Amino acid sequence: MAKLSKRMRVIREKVDGTKEYSINEAIALLKELATAKFVESVDVAVNLGIDARKSDQNVRGATVLPHGTGRDVRVAVFTQGANAEAAKAAGAELVGMDDLADLVKKGEMNFDVVIASPDAMRVVGQLGQILGPRGLMPNPKVGTVTPNVAEAVKNAKAGQVRYRNDKNGIIHTTLGKVSFDEVQLKENLESLLVALKKAKPSSAKGIFIKKVSISTTMGAGVAVDQASLEAQG
């Protein structure tokens, strides 16, 4: 059996895997154990009461976290005309049509989010095999195919997170950085859970949000007692 690192031993001693912690305790624990030499992200895993094998129970969408994600997001927009000027004014780093598609085909993808106006999808559609595997393909369900590209750019810059359940019915996304204060992380989590509850499929029965766990980039997951969120919020 591989020998545990000192860091992992400390984490195992501090985190009780059988316990659900109040949100305040969970965040304090993450901060205490975040000893990496870089500012770690705080991520969340939400187990949903869905059957992920059924397409009508899959959950996908996007929401803007009230305190952002702590990341500088570079945005590329496929559009033209007045929309192109609006996208640039909103802060998009790259704006274009065929010229932007050529950059993507060359592998020059110095961006984190791709947005497209509906009329640009004839160009973007040719890039599916490149953008799709990277999770960058624009989609109307998450607001990245839209006639209002300026608003989409502003949302991306403001800290919008996209979510989609995996094959096990779990949502994985980010809540911010471990340098955020307790209130910021708590409010970001509550905002995400509100968005998920609104996205509950009508065919999903029983308890929808079954388990919530938060973790840092290099840390273990800490289960959160949902009652502590409701009691404090």
Swiss-Prot record:
One example GO MF annotation: structural constituent of ribosome
GO cellular component: cytosolic large ribosomal subunit
InterPro entries from the UniProt entry: Ribosom_uL1_bac-type, Ribosomal_uL1, Ribosomal_uL1-like, Ribosomal_uL1/biogenesis, Ribosomal_uL1_3-a/b-sand, Ribosomal_uL1_CS
GO biological process: regulation of translation; translation
HAMAP family found in the cross-reference section: Ribosomal_uL1_B
Annotated function: Binds directly to 23S rRNA. The L1 stalk is quite mobile in the ribosome, and is involved in E site tRNA release.
Protein's name in the database: Large ribosomal subunit protein uL1
